């Protein structure tokens, strides 16, 4: 694509490789080697290139504006590693230093200057992983995600975050030890304030300087792929930092943000909202995400704050209705459809995940039926209900048992991912362990029960770092995790439990093979609120089945009976109360043979001891002939609604 064609398609919103044109690029012009700098500032009066190579003199290198509002200059003064900015004379005459929106590196905070950088061509060695990903996809594969804030998983003695070179040596072996299938990073793009956790971005094409060089992250991803671990990154296409030297009112007029003040300003987050209906902004954002997928071989993108992009009244502030008087943001809606359409056309095996908190449907529906086209939606309703239930005193749980069972009424309306994310362990919400009811023993018992329920419930999985071993305190973004907790035997056993649970998930196809239809689950009993016991069967494509029973109160139930559709000899393959995991049981239940007898819609029964505050999972060891094998005629098995 020549330069003029690149500009034309930029203006029509069809240039998705914009970073190859705008920004700083090494070139040869008339036999001279140097760099060409280009920046989009259509309403600026003047733009000058300044940097180390001009001793920061503001008027030494003027740039020339073309008909498309792009300013350009070639210079042989700039060298690899030099820091630079654009000195912009805005429409009103006010002058301001601005970042290069297309830079691939920035200097360390608190500086915001771009660094002249040509990304090296990496010779990737993850071809086998990519081939498998293309062949297998992810819908019928295990997806169990470890969510990480790269700046606080571990820190150096001086308090600085680990670089990706360090994370490669320590985090990847930890992922392997813990048997996760994927890692998801909170935003890695350049951001001026660490306390924003990366959710108020400045440089959309650049890796945050504190995390190391781009090639270090490439090597990290490659090493993950070598160990069969996928890499997902959070991305924020809805809003950006309000800082004057970044994207905000770049040329003195609304450039990246909406013209309408109410639509532009995000009061809740102190940010500015992208004008998602503007062609140039669409080119910018889609180019950004394709850049990250291409340069870093990412396996998934989690799109942050989708509700903010969909609803004009999402922010608790004055808002401007759409042309029909409603609150739906048509520009955001159509942008998200187009985003997923473009990404899926080129990268069908890259996951697109929506963090969307409303009750809107069709987030994962196809565009043809009015959907947005995401692969997965975070199930925030399930997460809120289930955490509220597990925090409650068991005496009262029978009155709120619908909090556990309600999800079965809507579980397949979207393709869901079940998140216990960073948002649930900050701002006074308590750590996952401290959310659990009771004394320390019962808190860990509840946590083992909860995590087993998450693994057995239909949907892909996500757990935030530190939660895997029951970290004592809330997450603090400016400190490393409380690794000293692992000196406590209860935390060490909790960590071992989570690693074994993750392996259990990977080993049993019925827990991930059919995640999006009732073919993958059969409810045995969702109405036993008096005992607060829930039971269901997870099913695979080739007849594999696991019987999952959850006792959600601290009362052991001897001679507990459930109905089953298949006669046979069953063995307990999972029990959250084993001593090795912090419980009190020395061994599993003995194998049990079903008995003929009417139990609800079933004519086979299984009787065993159900551990207090425990989860018990059974697998058929040998099928027996029976003339009375019955399948539950109500696969949802839930009569009660919220």
UniProtKB/Swiss-Prot annotation:
Alphabetized GO MF terms: 1,4-alpha-glucan branching enzyme activity; cation binding; hydrolase activity, hydrolyzing O-glycosyl compounds
GO CC terms in record: cytoplasm; cytosol
Record pathway: Glycan biosynthesis; glycogen biosynthesis
Entry annotated with the keyword Transferase: yes
Reaction catalyzed: Transfers a segment of a (1->4)-alpha-D-glucan chain to a primary hydroxy group in a similar glucan chain
Catalytic residues as annotated in Swiss-Prot or TrEMBL: 304 (nucleophile), 355 (proton donor)
Keywords for the protein's UniProt record, in alphabetical order: Carbohydrate metabolism, Glycogen biosynthesis, Glycogen metabolism, Glycosyltransferase, Transferase
Entry keyword Zinc-finger: no
Superkingdom, natural source: Bacteria
Database matches in InterPro entries: A-amylase/branching_C (IPR006048), Branching_enzy (IPR037439), GlgB (IPR006407), GlgB_N_E_set_prok (IPR044143), Glyco_hydro_13_cat_dom (IPR006047), Glyco_hydro_13_N (IPR004193), Glyco_hydro_b (IPR013780), Glycoside_hydrolase_SF (IPR017853)
The protein's Enzyme Commission number: 2.4.1.18
Gene Ontology biological process terms, A to Z: glycogen biosynthetic process
Xref: HAMAP family: GlgB
Family that this chain belongs to: Belongs to the glycosyl hydrolase 13 family. GlgB subfamily.
Complex and partners: Monomer.
Protein task: Catalyzes the formation of the alpha-1,6-glucosidic linkages in glycogen by scission of a 1,4-alpha-linked oligosaccharide from growing alpha-1,4-glucan chains and the subsequent attachment of the oligosaccharide to the alpha-1,6 position.
Entry protein name: 1,4-alpha-glucan branching enzyme GlgB
